[in-house]
Amino acid sequence: MHLIEVTSADTAKDFLEVQAIINAGNPNYIRPLNNEVNDVFDTAKNKNFKYGEAKRWILESDNGELVGRIAAFTNSKYINKGTDFKTGGVGFFDCINDQAAANLLFDTAKAWLSQKGMEAMDGPINFGDRDKWWGLMVEGFDKPPMYGMSYNPEYYETLFTNYGFQNYYNQYYYAMSVKDELPTRFPERHARFAAKPDYVAKHVKLSELEKYAGDFATVYNAAWAQHGEAKEITKEQVIKLFKTMKPIMDERLVWFAYYKAEPIGMFINIPDLNQYFKHFNGKLGWFQKLRLLYMSKTGKNKQLTGLAFGIVPKYQSLGIDSFMIQECSLLIKDKDWYDRYEMGWAGDWNPKMLNIYKSLGAQPSRRMVTFRCLFDASKPFERHPEMVYG
């Protein structure tokens, strides 16, 4: 086998192709967009290069066939509560079912990370935010992945654990029918807040996205700052995100809650983009964009996915979540717009979020795992600590 560092357009193209080759013949596999994967490793487009570095490798068999790939990253902004040693990341791992091949890829990433002063590696993760390509799928292979979700053959878990990776935390997805009635606590709490004029829940207007970008930043920074792992986000960053999302955004799915006009909660959902991208084989040129626009306007997508959820800490135990979710349900439940809703992942270290999922009547749909490998095997391994709520 031959390991090749990605340093050219040709090797970058091969890096993209490895995953498609490994998953060939799997009817549930949906190829990620080529440009989105490339952007992760573009120093001009990925802001994380301000805080770290990334390397990529591909693995060829002796007869020149592509049989594996891996990327490794350092990022000074990658923080986990309870971790007091430098931790790098590995991601975009794909490999044939061969432990020796997998070990060569892991060894290469480990050696590079060690040179950079890292003492452990987490993976598979992304050189970026945790909403995309984060974790290894270990349950849920019976359905296609949602947009931004990792998807891999079942044997990958064995390749990771045989090398010495351990379960750092589980990532749970939950799903439900949009048509289902919500449990009684939701309409009851909704009625309580609806009777108080100071509390308002409303969906966004696409014509006013800049205003809602500020509300998003306010809630996100307040809701997640308590955990100490999420980076603060600016209004300008959210404006950029919203502009990117606008062509496929359904304003009826993006909700905010307010108290005396101050944003205190958000419930952000979008149509599952993979229902469109599965037709594109990784491409997003002008033809695919026209097709995407057509499909998004003609009701071809019946699946929703959760993008972000948060409540400002001092309002978290009041039932604002029920108020906001019930408002959304009242609008869409009896319409023929959507059928299935699958929520974004929640870590086992965030029991409050998992309880919200369960309270909706949703059922577990998939499980991912973020693994950790300590370079010094004599060090004690500790799982991610449970979130401390403010």
Label each residue range with its predicted role.
Residues N80-G164, F280-L360:
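Acyl-donor binding region in acyl/amide transferases
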Residues Y258-Y259, F267-L273, L307-P313, M324, ...:
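Active-site proximal loops enriched in glycine and acidic residues that flank catalytic Cys/His/Asp
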Residues M1-Y29, N34, D376:
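Generic start-of-chain signal for non-secretory N-termini
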Residues S150-E229:
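Acyltransferase donor/substrate-recognition loop-hinge adjacent to the catalytic core
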Residues A175-H190, T370-G390:
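C-terminal "cap" of GNAT-fold acetyltransferases
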Residues Q19-D62, I70-N80, H203, S207-G310:
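A conserved beta-strand-loop-helix scaffold within acyl/acetyltransferase catalytic domains
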Residues A12, L66, S76-I79, D129-D131, ...:
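Flexible loop/turn segments at secondary-structure boundaries
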